[in-house]
Amino acid sequence: MLRLMRQQKKETYYLWIALFLLLLYVSPLFILKEDAHIRVHDNLDSNIAWYKVLADSGEIVGKVDAAIPQIINGLPRDAFGTEWSGIVWLHAFFSSMTAYAISQTVTRVVAFFGMYVLLKKHIIPEPKAAFIRIGVSLAFALTPFWPSGMLSTLGYPLALWAFLNIRKGDISWREWLTLGLLPLYSSFVLGFFFFLAGMACFWLYDAITKRRWNLMFLGSIAFMTSIYLFVEYRLVYSMLFEHAPMHRIEFISSRHDVWHSLRLSIKNFVYGHNHVMTVHTVVILPILMVVFAALLFKRNRTKPENVYLFLCVLNYGLSLWYAFWFNKIWAVPKQKFAFLAEFNFARFHFLRPLVIYVSFALALYLIWRMGKGWKWLVYAAVAAQLMVLAPFNEEYTYGVHYNAPTFREFYASEQFKEIKEYIGRPQDSYRVASIGLHPSIAQYNGFYTLDTYNNLYPLSYKYEFRKIIEKELEKNSRLKQYFDEWGSRCYLFVDELGKRYDFKKNSKKTINNLQLNTDVFKKMGGRYIFSSVPIMNAEQNHLALVKTFDHKDSAWRIYLYETR
């Protein structure tokens, strides 16, 4: 009993240290506030501006057929997701940076405790293995996840804990509350659809091998799914009722041959994916491979060892599925069935962070059980993984490694306030577009834009907007394919700039041969163009440079052009 109490005390001590390190990790967001560096891709260039536009529009709880006039002359309200998502209300009640900091903290804390209770209850319950449970949980919580995903992947361990409890018949209000609340801070289509599909397969496996239905387990899966369908009622409505075709129906993603797909599967297996970064290559992967090789031909394997081998196979299987979703074999089915083109089923690989870190914990536990002479390796592996993850803190990654703008410098609110005041007209009375800049910057500052980055907008608008940039696309096959076969970035693409939208004020870049159809631009309501680089042949495009704007708190020099 005394030994058990000492173990519990040590575990509590480890927990407090881990929580301190976790809060230290997110502290720059609260200390630096708008002077913090955070992710640009699929974050500053999109989601953060979306939340602000939605909050400012007054359409958070708008009708299913409502539109947001600030973007592309009426972006469907459904493009911004559901009002039942907690992150929407964080951005409605707090400033953007404060909401972001809170969201990061909530997500990482829930991820930590979710993985911890999963490992303690179902994977590594042995009291003496507390260091493994807590160390791996902390590492999982520090992974550089996609910010607007919230708990879409980092919530998997907590959900799995609840489902495994229900599967065993160990049921309380906690499990049902967990399954009921997670849909309010995660995405169905960007995460939990794939997890719930996995749970359904797990239930089916039980039903076949154990010959029992386990209706409570099945009911819990149905319960969480029904909550998601309620939360995502806008998505359900759009699927059930006719509406104008959206640009996603023209997605073309299946281009790879078999060898390309195999190479991509290995790349994904070894390095992971940008939206679900696991940072497992240097420390975790070698350990997983060595333990896998040691167990593969072992006789009389234990249950934890068999579970470990299954997870390793599943790990590569998910990478293989991801890679082959872009293979040519899917080209015809995607053409015949629109939902296969519109919905990215490759995202089953979003399960990999859960699989990798549970596998890591199991591998360390199997090593730890080999005796005292091996425990040093366990401590070293956890410490090494935490050290590998430390530089992936956003402040270091984007501030030092990428030298990206701070939040304040990116959105440049004071500079764009000067532009708004200089124009001197109500912002809803004219439309703007940007060159060499993300449209989210203008959107964040209240301007009505003809360009945008959204994952859902009318196909007819894409066709109309394309007329503006048609000649530029013809000059650049990569940009043409990028816009025509994907098109979520509905930008004023310029051949000479390529896919760069971040020319800072110290850039020497110029545009010498711009060819825009400004007649179509004006017909759509366009009046001004914000460019981060000078356009040397502006007059040939019926554009006149009105003024250049600089500001000490901005990363950009804005050349304001007006149509003539």
Curated annotation (Swiss-Prot):
Entry's localization field: Cell membrane
InterPro entries named in the record: DUF6044 (IPR046107)
Leader peptide range in chain numbering: none
GO (cellular component) term, any one: plasma membrane
UniProt keyword annotations, A-Z: Cell membrane, Membrane, Transmembrane, Transmembrane helix
Keyword Cell inner membrane listed: no
The keyword Cell membrane is annotated on this UniProt entry: yes
Membrane topology of this protein: Multi-pass membrane protein
Annotated Pfam families: DUF6044 (PF19510)
TM annotation in the entry: 12-32, 97-119, 139-161, 188-208, 213-233, 277-297, 306-326, 348-368
Protein name per the record: Uncharacterized membrane protein YkoS
